[in-house]
Structures are given as C-alpha cells and as structure tokens.
C-alpha cells in the first residue's frame, strides 16, 4: 500500500517556520534599506539575498521531505558528506589569513567567503549533520539500546573505545576540528546537540 507523505506533514513546524522567515525578511528590509541608501549601495541587495536563502531552504525542505528513509540512512552518502564537512572545516583553519576565501571573522577561522553571495560557515551544517548522523546510527541500534540501555551507547572494552570508538569518532572529530578554529560557541552547541540526541 502506497502512503501519501502529505498526510504526515507536520504543519505545526512548517507554518511557524514560514511565518518567522517572512518576519525575518521584513525586519531585514526595515533595518538595512536606510543604511544601504546612505552608503550609496543597492538598497534591496541584502533583502534579495535573504529572500533567496529562504527560497533555497524551502526547496531543500521539499527535496529532503520527498526522500525515502532508505536514502537518508545510506551510510555511503552519510560518509561522503561527513568527509566533505570535516575537510571544509580543516580548509578554513589551515589556509593563511591572507587567503580571501577563508579570511578570519572576529578572530575565528570558520567561514568560507563566496564572492557575490556572502559567507558560509561549515559549523552550521555540522549541527544538522550531527542530528542526521546520530539519528541514523541509533535507528539501526534501537533494539540493542532498548535491551542494554546506556551500555549499548558506550560500548567498548577500554575507556578510550567507549568514548572515541565506533560511531563516536566522527562526532569527536567534528568537535575537535571546530574547537581549534577557535569557535567555542559552535563547539558547545554541537556538543549539546550530540548529548541531547544520545
């Protein structure tokens, strides 16, 4: 029997998101237009950028919502995205300060500057990835976790294996790479997200 996924759409999440996104665009318009005019720049540039990102996010929501659960649990895809994420974080850290694409912002090295668009912070994607990754891990261990409780989550012969082995290694790697940016704020948020998921 084919189920209509529209029946499972959670409007209590979607509608507040759309309302907040709309309010955000209006607020950016009201606060940036006078400043942009004063500087002699395009008054609608920042509003257009924000609107473009909101539309992009809606498209991404639609695409992800239409994905089959099997695709979201695909270990190969998760692994590829994890490697890209960690490499982008390392790229931000090791490139010299004079390199325009990764110039520091407020002393931290976690941003990639994209000409004509703005900045992208890989750590922001790391928060979403951690939720996705841990949800995938725990969904495959559900029966074992119900049976063995916390012992299944921190499985290992030694303390090192219990803390850093198996599925925990990618989480620790992302936390450490983000910490050396230095970006303590995002590191704490990612760590908190991981703990909540556990």
Swiss-Prot record:
UniProt superkingdom: Bacteria
GO cellular component, one term: cell division site
Protein's cellular compartments: Cell membrane
Main location: membrane
Membrane topology annotation: Multi-pass membrane protein
TM stretches of this protein: 13-33, 44-64, 77-97, 171-191
Coiled coil: none
Biological pathway: Cell wall biogenesis; peptidoglycan biosynthesis
Family: Belongs to the SEDS family. FtsW subfamily.
Purpose: Peptidoglycan polymerase that is essential for cell division.
Official protein name in the record: Probable peptidoglycan glycosyltransferase FtsW
